[in-house]
Amino acid sequence: MNPGSAPWERRTRERMRAMSRKNGEWGDVRVGGVPGLSARVRPLPGAAGADTQPDWIDVTVMPREEPAAASRRRTSPRPPVRSRAEVHQAGLAESAQFHQSLMRWLEAHHLLGAVRSVSEPGSMPMLHLRCAPRVLDQLRRAPEFEAGTMMPLDLI
């Protein structure tokens, strides 16, 4: 038997030829420079185009610390020693409270539609949002939050 002449190999070659005719060859014009999308392929009805969808950015949000609290901390005596479990439970409670306050703030400022995802509360009062740039602008103006963007991995 010749190599490449097995029945399953012939069927595979025939399928590959049929798919290349159906989807176009690599030399076809690509949509938006994206490989694998042919200019002959139409978007689904009702699909939002790239011009109508906001550019999503990754944002880190934390509660803003008051300067007076930092100066009081230097002069105050050392806090009592707590177990790691107590510190962890206190962090979970503080993070959950911060998550609720951020969600209430987003709802009050009518920004929930511009937020794609919000991370779950953890053991630190810090959340990650995937949102439109206007949400970051509003968060930076708010006196109760400290917000900034994350560097994309492709720039590292």
From Swiss-Prot:
It comes from the Bacteria. The keyword Lipid biosynthesis does not apply. Residues 1-89 are annotated as: Disordered. In response to starvation, RelA is activated resulting in the accumulation of (p)ppGpp, which causes the degradation of PopD in an FtsH(D)-dependent manner, thereby releasing pre-formed PopC for secretion. Keywords: Cytoplasm. Residues 8-28 have a biased composition (Basic and acidic residues). Disruption phenotype: Deletion mutant has a severe growth defect, forms tan colonies and fails to develop. Mutant shows increased accumulation of PopC in the supernatant. Disulfide bonds: none annotated. Its main location: cytoplasm. It is found in: Cytoplasm. GO terms for cellular component: cytoplasm. Inhibitor of protease PopC. In non-starving cells, forms a cytoplasmic complex with PopC and inhibits PopC secretion and activity. Interacts with PopC in non-starving cells. This is PopC secretion inhibitor. It comes from Myxococcus xanthus (strain DK1622).
